[in-house]
Structure formats: structure tokens, C-alpha cells
């Protein structure tokens, strides 16, 4: 929500915690069908038995190993974070032309698609997912 507000974008959060951010089309793309970018905000963390991290409270400390970003003793936890990062990067970029965007960020995906199930998709207007 803070990201959207800082970028002057329309946003709302539903009772479940899902977030919808809307961005207008860039010049020249106003008549193109809108596009939905979607990702989920939750993740499942896993760790080795000897890893001291409390995955509910502690930060994961990434390391670069052989050119790959990894985490010691735990999963990196990227999961669908890449979809969220991609969507926010597109919204932030000044050099990526696009039609009107609706960024849908859902919660509780890992425990049964609860966020997506609670979302009112009839409010979305984009032509493509």
C-alpha cells in the first residue's frame, strides 16, 4: 500500500488482506486492453534442524554461492516473491510502456488459495491475465 501511495497509484486492500493496485496506461497505450499482473504475498519457509533462525521473526540472510543467491540453513523463501517484485518493478519503471495495469497481490495462497477465493474478481476490468 505504501509503495502504491508513494507512486501516486490507486490502491485498496480488502478485508482478507489482498491488495489491488491500479496504474494508468502509459502514453500511446491508452486504447490497448488492460493487463493483470498477479502474485501472492505469503511463503512457506523451511530450514535444517540445526538452523537457529526463527522463521516467524528472524530475517533470512542471503549469500551468493557460485553465482547463485542462496540462504544458509533455510530456503531462500523467494517463492512467488518474484511475481510481486516483477509487478512492482513494472509499476516503478519509467521506461516500460504498458496498457492500464491491475496488480493483484493475494494472501494465504500457501494454505489453500484463501486470499484468491475471497477476492471479488468482478471488480477487475483488464482484458488479459
For each of these PLM feature ranges, what is it?
Residues 29-100, 105, 110, 117-120, ...:
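Active-site metal-coordination/substrate-binding segment of hydrolases
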Residues 2-5, 17-20, 84-87, 110-114:
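Short amphipathic alpha-helical surface micro-motifs
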Amino acid at each position: 500500500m505504501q509503495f502504491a501511495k508513494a507512486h501516486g497509484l490507486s490502491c485498496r486492500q480488502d478485508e482478507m488482506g489482498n491488495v489491488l493496485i491500479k496504474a494508468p496506461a502509459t502514453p500511446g497505450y491508452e486504447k490497448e486492453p488492460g493487463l493483470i499482473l498477479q502474485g501472492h504475498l505469503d511463503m512457506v519457509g523451511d530450514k535444517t534442524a540445526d538452523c537457529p533462525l526463527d522463521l516467524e521473526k528472524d530475517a533470512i540472510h542471503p549469500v551468493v554461492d557460485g553465482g547463485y543467491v542462496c540462504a544458509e540453513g533455510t530456503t531462500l523463501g523467494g517463492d512467488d516473491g518474484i511475481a510481486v517484485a516483477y509487478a512492482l518493478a513494472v509499476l516503478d519503471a519509467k521506461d516500460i510502456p504498458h496498457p492500464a495495469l491491475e496488480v493483484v497481490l493475494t494472501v494465504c495462497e500457501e494454505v489453500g488459495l484463501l486470499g484468491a477465493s475471497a477476492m471479488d474478481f468482478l471488480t477487475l476490468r483488464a482484458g488479459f491475465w
